[in-house]
Each structure stands twice: as C-alpha cells, then as structure tokens.
Curated annotation (Swiss-Prot):
Catalytic site positions: H78 (proton acceptor)
Gene: PER29
Protein family per UniProt: Belongs to the peroxidase family. Classical plant (class III) peroxidase subfamily.
UniProt remark on cofactor binding: Binds 1 heme b (iron(II)-protoporphyrin IX) group per subunit.
Record protein name field: Peroxidase 29
GO cellular component: extracellular region
Misc. comment: There are 73 peroxidase genes in A.thaliana.
Organism: Arabidopsis thaliana (Mouse-ear cress)
E.C. numbers: 1.11.1.7
Record PROSITE patterns: PEROXIDASE_4 (PS50873)
Length: 339
C-alpha cells in the first residue's frame, strides 16, 4: 500500500460513485420505531423530499472532492460520541465560551461542517424550520457510506439540536485517543449498546479516508507497540511516509497515509489489512489479532454482505445515541448558531 495522489483518488471516486448508486442496497427496518422517540417516517408529511435533497447536494460534491465522504462520516462519529447526536459539533462558541469541543486535539482535522450548513440552507428553502441539523449530519454520513459503495442504511429520524456546545474538557474525556486498544474500543461501543460483532463492524468506517501522521507517530512512542499485530514491512512504510518529526508538529499534522489500499471505496479491504497487520492505528492492527475480535474480522473480510448488515445495525445504534427529541432540543435555522 502506498499514498494515493488526489488525481488518482478523484478518478477512482468519479467512476465508482455512479456505480455505487445503482448497487447500494437499503438495509434497516422500514417500520415505525419508538427508539428514543425517532421514526423512519418522521418527515413524511413535513418535509418528504429531505433525503432526496441531502443526497443530491452530496453527489456532485463527492465527485469534486473524494475525501468528503470520510470527512462527513468522521463528523457524525465525533458529534455522536460527545454527549450524543445533537449537532453540537457545528456550533460556534456561544457568548463568552472560550474552549469548545472543536478545540479538543482529538477533533483535529474535522471538516465539512460548512457542507452540512449548505445542505441545511437548501432544506430551509424547501421546508423551513422542519429538519434539524443533527438529522442532516446523520443523513449526510449515511449517504457518504452509500455513495462510496457501502450499504444505503435506513435510519430513523426526528433528532433535535442542542442549545449549547460541550467544553473542550468534555470532548477530551469522551472521544477515544488515537492509541486506543481493543479493550478501550469494545467498552466504548458497548456503552452504546453494540455487540462485539457490531463494534468490529463500526470500525470498518476506517475503510475510507486517511490517517494523519501525528496519530500514526504516537504508536511508535507507545511502550506497548511491540505487542501490536504489526507487519514489520508495513511499519517501515509508515516510518518512511511519516518521518520522525514530533507528533505535535505542523508537518505531522499536514502529512497523512490512506486508511487502506482502496481508501475512497467502502469495502472490506480494511479487514484484509487488519488480518495482515497493516493497520495505521493501534486498534486497526490489534483488532485482527485479539481472540475476541479476530473471528469477526475474518468473517467480514470473507463476506461483504455480513459486514454491511452488521455495520448498518451499528450505525443505527450510534446515530440514535443520547438523541434529543420532542421538547428536549430545538431545530436551528442555521446550524452554527442557536436561534
């Protein structure tokens, strides 16, 4: 595996996105759900074109910028993991608030907040004050998976937006570190109701996108690095791709390596790499060796349908975590400000 040029990524993505729209399958329960007050038909009467508007807004953007899907998926993960899926990650500091969740080093590289805001603007023209920013984040992440070749997941909607953004301290405590191991990861997702199989599946989100070198270099400073399932040749590759500068330097932050050999396609290559010890992060390597997770890694590598089904189930659980519904939250007119 080697770093991909933006031209190569763009060409691959442009061709693949058209095919993925034809091949994606809808996975998920289509019936009404009372899970956290969400519903699969929430906007049926108030904004029936919501999913169409979100998808059409994203399709052209993904062709122009093939890194967008991974950015939107990460945006959703980081929003949901800090006090639930409430679009707080989109808010600018409120009044005298100095350090918000976006100031956390763990949120380094968060992008495409503006794209969510642009989609929200389009929705306001179609159906004012009906669709929450938190639902837009979930739908955008869902479509990011589908438009790169993954399953088109049916997600319940009806989330409301928060009135404030958590502090940097809260984000620091709730987002996992780049050095997270299997124990930390399984505990994190178990708290969101996921089985081990679903936890391994949701890690498959790493099949698209890149890893910044500041997170890769932290592995080499880890005293337990020698116990990781890491191919020595791949370690050499990482050291060449991410030279020995400080993990906190600007050079480390600006340099990155692809997550797997098909980093613009949502497929099972991540699991092939995990088995072979070719993971950028510690968890990416250890997940293929730990006896609790390896059977599922092997199963997903061999059976894409099983991976897609487990990922879809995990995605719905994560996107339904600690949501605000009814009068618990609001619907912002503009995503980065409270009305």
């Amino acid at each position: 595996m080697k770093p991909k040029s933006k031209v190569a990524e763009s060409t691959a993505a442009s061709c693949f996105l058209v095919m993925s729209l034809l091949c994606s399958c809808i996975i998920g329960d289509q019936m009404e759900t009372n899970n956290e007050g969400l519903s699969y038909s929430y906007y049926e009467k108030t904004c029936p074109k919501v999913e169409e508007i979100v998808r059409s807004s994203l399709s052209s953007m993904f062709i122009l910028d093939p890194t967008s899907p991974a950015a939107l998926l990460r945006l959703m993960f980081h929003d949901c993991q800090v006090q639930g899926c409430d679009a707080s990650i989109l808010l600018e500091p409120i009044r005298d608030q100095q350090f918000t969740e976006l100031d956390s080093a763990k949120n380094f590289g968060i992008r495409k907040r503006d794209l969510v805001g642009s989609i929200k603007t389009s929705l306001e023209l179609e159906c004012p004050k009906q669709v929450s920013c938190s639902d837009v984040i979930i739908l955008a992440a869902r479509d990011a998976v589908a438009l790169t070749g993954g399953p088109l997941i049916s997600v319940p909607l009806g989330r409301k937006d928060s009135l404030s953004t958590p502090s940097k301290h809260v984000a620091d405590s709730e987002l996992p570190p780049s050095t997270a191991d299997v124990d930390t990861t399984l505990s994190l997702f178990a708290n969101k109701g996921m089985t081990i199989e679903e936890s391994v599946a949701i890690m498959g989100a790493h099949t698209i996108g890149v890893t910044h070198c500041n997170n890769v270099l932290s592995r080499f400073d880890n005293a337990n690095a020698t116990s990781e399932n890491m191919d020595p040749r791949f370690q050499t590759f990482l050291r060449v791709a991410c030279p020995e500068f400080s993990p906190t330097s600007q050079a480390a932050e600006a340099t990155f390596v692809p997550n797997d050999q098909t980093s613009v396609i949502f497929d099972t290559a991540y699991y092939d790499d995990a088995i072979a010890g070719r993971g950028n992060l510690r968890i990416d390597s250890e997940i293929g060796a730990d006896p609790r997770t390896r059977p599922f890694v092997e199963a997903f590598a061999a059976d894409q349908d099983r991976f897609f089904n487990a990922f879809s189930s995990a995605f719905v659980k994560l996107s339904s975590y600690k949501v605000l519904t009814g009068n618990e939250g609001v619907i912002r007119s503009v995503c980065d400000k409270v009305d």
